[in-house]
Amino acid sequence: VFFLKSYRKPRELTWLSGILLLFLMLGFGFSGYLLPWDELAYFATKVGTGIAGAVPIVGHFTLRLLRGGDDVTGATLSRFYGLHVAILPAVTTALVALHLLFVQQQGMSVPLSIERKLKPGERLPQMRFFPNYILRDVLAWYVVLAVLAALAAFYPWELGTKADPFA
């Protein structure tokens, strides 16, 4: 992004939608971490929501909103589950569609050196979205999925002891 200057005109909205997708992925990671409901997840969520609670003025409200009360309880688990499996996927789907629409309309960002070589009024040579970009993305997704499946099969993450804050 920095080297290609992807955030410059006319692609500001494409860049902003990509940044929002990044924050949504961080939200998936944060909300999904609690779902095993083991001790590590319990205390990590307690610390993570406590950090949100430390924000001046809106912190206490945010803390209570995230936790569903003053403490991390079953209500917090229900909130994070609903957020993780319903709200975040719906928002992500809509934002990915919007991001792809922006990419289709405005094209991909190219290095400044290539843009400088263009004559006034000349357009960049375009590569078709389908099948070129789609096939590259599908191939990359399958490679990442294969690596993730191999890691899960060969190095499974064991669930810890069940979260019991009163023990």
Regions found by a protein language model. Give the residues of each.
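Membrane-embedded and interfacial regions of multi-pass energy-transducing membrane proteins
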Residues: F2-A167
